[in-house]
């Protein structure tokens, strides 16, 4: 995940490097220190929607064998003892779990930063009140375009209106809310209008996710945004983030699932805002370190299986029913876990020779695996030109 606004604000209002790093950021200290990973927890696989890019291939049916309340509570205790700073409660649709607010309450009581990842369509006024009372630190709701586009992605007429209503209900109660948008060739044209909506509706955060090749996203990967379209989308997001930063407006722009974004941001700043200290920006991005899968980001699925991240369900390190998460996460006998924790990662192709490997970290291994069969091959989703990843003439920032 690239916290665009945080990076830009850090060079507009400089502070000592390493201060205020986001939970799960992939800085060197975080990689070697005692803090556990951010855990994205798919508590349930059932969902009232069947989205075209869903990585979990969720559907409106019950999936047997899911962790019950007691098991979830037990695992949370282990996660807390291991130093996990944040839980992202996801699905499926997590609000379909009858115990979701009990789980959220326990997470808050244990001191976790607790976020809810939802499609929003089930949130009416009473449920919004319960979300607010539960004390979620953040609620992310997906909007993959404007009305017609979003409803097509969701395969549900009226989904856009319900999700937008949920954003408004939660916002008006004082809950920090954000819009998640997965970029594809089919919805890129809606991005300017969606960014305008985020501004008009006073939404706290906008998260642009690149399409990752998991679940239905892999089935539909031919609809991934073309590289030119990807760059144009990022130009727009970066420009909005910079405009907010220079005006001192509190608005959080984030991108994810393509760690080349950090390198592209660095080039974008050099080109469009040359008065900023690009060498300091590079130092900040390098301290965050790019891809965090298997290191500072973890996933637990609905059955209790532990994965490197949410997109890699066909790579399992163990199950929290039979073994503590803390033991599973420290065990590097699995070759994928060992490779992800290795520094530097021994990736191949363009990734191996990239002059900005310290910023990107080798990008997303799932795409490489799905396209080539080799998890250490170059990421086919890297949209950077060869000259953009060659050695930079810019001097290194001295810390």
Feature annotation, model-predicted:
Residues 59, 92, 120, 144, ...:
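Flexible loop residues that form catalytic
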């Amino acid at each position: 995940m690239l916290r665009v606004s945080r990076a830009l604000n850090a060079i507009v209002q400089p502070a000592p490097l390493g201060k205020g790093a986001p939970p799960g950021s992939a800085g060197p200290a975080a990689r070697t220190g005692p803090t556990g990973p951010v855990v994205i927890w798919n508590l349930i696989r059932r969902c009232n929607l069947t989205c075209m890019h869903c990585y979990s291939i969720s559907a409106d049916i019950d999936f047997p064998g899911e962790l019950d309340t007691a098991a979830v509570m037990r695992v949370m205790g282990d996660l807390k003892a291991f130093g996990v700073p944040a839980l992202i409660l996801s699905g499926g649709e997590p609000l379909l779990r009858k115990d979701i607010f009990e789980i959220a309450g326990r997470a808050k009581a244990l001191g976790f930063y607790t976020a809810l990842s939802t499609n929003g369509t089930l949130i009416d006024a009473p449920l919004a009140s319960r979300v607010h009372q539960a004390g979620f630190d953040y609620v992310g709701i997906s909007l993959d375009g404007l009305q017609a586009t979003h409803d097509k992605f969701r395969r549900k007429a009226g989904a856009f209106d319900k999700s937008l209503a949920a954003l408004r209900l939660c916002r008006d109660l004082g809950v920090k809310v954000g819009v998640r948008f997965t970029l594809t060739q089919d919805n890129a044209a809606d991005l300017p209008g969606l960014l305008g909506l985020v501004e008009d509706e006073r939404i706290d955060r906008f998260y642009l996710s690149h399409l990752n090749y998991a679940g239905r996203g892999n089935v539909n990967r031919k609809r991934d945004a073309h590289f030119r379209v990807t760059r144009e989308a990022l130009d727009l997001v970066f420009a909005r983030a910079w405009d907010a930063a220079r005006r001192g407006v509190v608005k959080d722009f984030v991108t994810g699932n393509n760690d080349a974004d950090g390198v592209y941001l660095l080039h974008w700043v050099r080109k469009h805002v040359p008065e900023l200290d690009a060498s300091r920006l590079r130092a900040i991005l390098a301290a965050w370190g790019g891809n965090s899968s298997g290191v500072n980001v973890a996933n637990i699925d609905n059955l209790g299986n532990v994965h490197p991240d949410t997109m890699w369900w066909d790579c399992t390190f163990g199950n929290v029913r039979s073994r503590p998460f803390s033991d599973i996460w420290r065990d590097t006998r699995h070759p994928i876990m060992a490779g992800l924790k290795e520094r530097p990662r021994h990736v191949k192709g363009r990734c191996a020779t990239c002059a900005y490997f310290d910023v990107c970290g080798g990008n997303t291994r799932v795409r490489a695996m799905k396209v080539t069969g080799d998890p250490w091959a170059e990421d086919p989703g890297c949209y950077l030109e060869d000259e953009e990843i060659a050695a930079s003439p810019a001097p290194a920032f001295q810390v």
